[in-house]
């Protein structure tokens, strides 16, 4: 089912500003919150849709991506192409906790500031999805990625104010970022509506970042993928996330790795498994075959006479490197015996002759099995 338009979900226009988005979200969140609608699946689903829409549209970077690409901007890892993708979902700090402080502050008569006035605010963490091959996981690699992120504005140095000017202490909250109001017997504290909790106002905003203190830019980064890395591994690049606000530290970038399934090898920890089909005659008479391993070398496997289906051969040290270790796993070759198809008349005659010449010693397992079965049912 197609996802609803985020603007329609919040009931705002595509030109809605931060204040309009926040107001719409607060009203809808109070209406559909699970605590007010227990055991109501539709309200719970609507509540999740509202959260997702607001989380996207309140962030200038995500909103720009959504306006350009729609929901596709956040699918399969989000923006980006090739072997990886970018998405900030799930990591951005802050979220809508400050909104709920206001909502439940009004309902319960309390609330606590999430950040101090004009305080340093840490940048959001970012996520980048990267797919690599099993060969790359075996050898390791250095990957170049491009990540769209928010960086500190170089014109205003992150203040958000036009060069030569400074942000001013908010006159409404006196720099605290919070305001109090009496409602009956309760004293309600909420985020300052003038400075939106920052404790400062900017009368003359920077022309480049428009008062945000940050601008969006695509950065190129080198990521070291160590040998032996496993599927699902998370790599943290400290300080490579979004820039902080008002001098706060940058967030982190998390690389989530997935290893593409291989055509021939399956992995279990440091060990590799490979199924090799051989002919019925090779299994019966014995023989040899070569296997090319992940390091590019060839290993010869000797098949003894009378090899049965499922027989495993172990090639020691031919598996995956153990991460940050000198150890290496093993490669296990499992035999699959291929039954002949589309026999010629002569081949059929020879097999029939072979069948007539066969004895119990040639097929001990099947002979013994049917004998045991007959004895079981005959009593």
From Swiss-Prot:
Residues 5-70 form the J domain. GO terms for cellular component: cytoplasm. Zn(2+) 2 binds at residues 170, 173, 192, 195. Binds 2 Zn(2+) ions per monomer. It holds the Pfam family DnaJ_CXXCXGXG. The J domain is necessary and sufficient to stimulate DnaK ATPase activity. Zinc center 1 plays an important role in the autonomous, DnaK-independent chaperone activity of DnaJ. Zinc center 2 is essential for interaction with DnaK and for DnaJ activity. This is Chaperone protein DnaJ. It comes from Rhizobium radiobacter. The gene is dnaJ.
